[in-house]
Amino acid sequence: MGNVAGETRANVIPLHTNRSRVAARRRAGQRAESRQHPSLLSDPNDRASAEQIAAVVREIDEHRRAAGATTSSTEATPNDLAQLVAAVAGFLRQRLTGDYSVDEFGFDPHFNSAIVRPLLRFFFKSWFRVEVSGVENIPRDGAALVVANHAGVLPFDGLMLSVAVHDEHPAHRDLRLLAADMVFDLPVIGEAARKAGHTMACTTDAHRLLASGELTAVFPEGYKGLGKRFEDRYRLQRFGRGGFVSAALRTKAPIVPCSIIGSEEIYPMLTDVKLLARLFGLPYFPITPLFPLAGPVGLVPLPSKWRIAFGEPICTADYASTDADDPMVTFELTDQVRETIQQTLYRLLAGRRNIFFG
């Protein structure tokens, strides 16, 4: 067909030629590469780059394995706080389920090991830094009577003695303290003392404990030792009438003398206000450098350095059963125990350089 006069021919431009497709793909590839990590842009045929990447991967794996090992070792050895939390959780579970036992004196071993003893260990290890010697003189089993000096206004010495026996003795024995009646009349404290295994300081209870094969402790000085002035420190007071000796003789329990230094300095008593003591119904009302002037701060014991020494046991098996009622025998044995403790105190004091650092 011929062209019409005056008509202009239109040129058709192809939009999708192979060349344009290749150029578009190239531009898209460049944009994709610009969004990739630089480590992926290296030439895959470049051997050095591949080796470098492999080295980095190996290093990352090594760090990961090391971190995993550290985490495992950390989890295998929980810190003290984690142990305490776990102990409290276990304690609550057993208390709620009733999975614990109490003896005739009210001793609750579960309560003692989970609550009382962990609290006392802070004072034993960190505050008073107690050093123990002669613990091998305490029998591994069976009855025995530990006789110790008494001092310090508040009976921290008995509490530290119980921790020392349990933690330092190979058999980890529980020590049953014979305490003053007033302790068990106090709210909360009296009940806690019962649960910790302690009972009143009377011949009847002492005999029952020893007859049951329990390791028992007594402080024959009583309030006379606990409430003496600082100027009389480490001078033993009278040991009562020897009731503890009679109990040991009746049950054939060995007597283990025990000497404690450091307890006299925790509350240095300057004087005893007897009028206030009678007013409050107390055996004594102490005035120390910090109490009562410093208020509650004065109740914090000074961090003196403690030493507890157990002497060789005095055998009672060779005594006759009638000797327990013989005043001369009980007096002689009481005096022997007292003198042993006193001489050991002098020896320990002679080796001490400083009250607070030992």
From Swiss-Prot:
Biased composition of type Basic residues is found at 18-29
Pfam families, A to Z: Acyltransferase
> What is one GO cellular-component annotation here?
membrane
Top-level taxon of the source organism = Bacteria
Q: Could you tell me which CDD domains the record lists for this protein? A: LPLAT_MGAT-like (cd07987)
Molecular function GO terms recorded: acyltransferase activity
**Annotated region described as Disordered, given as residue ranges:** 1-47
Q: Which InterPro entries match?
A: P_lipid/glycerol_AcTrfase_prd, Plipid/glycerol_acylTrfase
Family designation? To M.leprae ML2427.
In its UniProt entry, what is this protein called? Uncharacterized protein Rv0502
The protein's organism comes out as Mycobacterium tuberculosis (strain ATCC 25618 / H37Rv)
